């Protein structure tokens, strides 16, 4: 882990970020840098560099699947949309991404999650339809 120079780790993360977000990558990172949440841009750079772009265990596509699986139960459609598209940008097929989404939805629903009422009350679930590709 520590054999790779920090500059290479950060570049690897930058390259993976660009792969996932494609033509909107600069805009999204700029928004994170300016959003008012201290160090969000730095945190993203470090997470992508040290964790998400490391392909020693998972491929980029498999990493995208893990991210999709983590985002669906959190009800964060804007982030989920980016990672659904990012999985395709990284080499997954639309059918594969839909299959991963479907399995995760089945697991969430089996765990008691559901579409919430319009006022957002009523337990664990989603405030709107879960994003898809």
For each predicted feature, which ranges?
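Extended intrinsically disordered, low-complexity coil regions enriched in Ser, Thr, Gly, Ala
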Residues: 76-106
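Short, structured motif recognition centered on aromatic/hydrophobic residues
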Residues: 62-72, 104
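Acidic, glycine/proline-rich low-complexity segments that act as flexible tails and inter-domain linkers
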Residues: 1-60, 94, 109-133
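A short, ordered amphipathic alpha-helix with a cationic face
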Residues: 37-38, 71-75
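Short helix-coil transition sites and intra-membrane helix breaks within transmembrane domains
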Residues: 73-78, 113
């Amino acid at each position: 882990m520590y054999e790779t120079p920090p500059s290479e780790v950060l570049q690897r993360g930058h390259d993976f970020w660009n792969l996932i977000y494609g033509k909107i990558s600069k805009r999204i990172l700029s928004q994170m840098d300016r959003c008012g949440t201290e160090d969000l841009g730095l945190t993203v750079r470090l997470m992508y560099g040290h964790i998400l772009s490391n392909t020693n265990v998972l491929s980029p596509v498999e990493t995208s699947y893990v991210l999709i699986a983590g985002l669906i139960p959190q009800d964060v459609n804007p982030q989920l949309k980016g990672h659904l598209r990012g999985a395709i940008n990284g080499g997954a097929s639309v059918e594969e991404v839909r299959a991963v989404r479907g399995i995760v939805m089945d697991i969430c629903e089996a765990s008691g999650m559901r579409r919430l009422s319009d006022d957002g009350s009523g337990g664990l679930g989603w405030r709107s339809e879960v994003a898809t590709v």
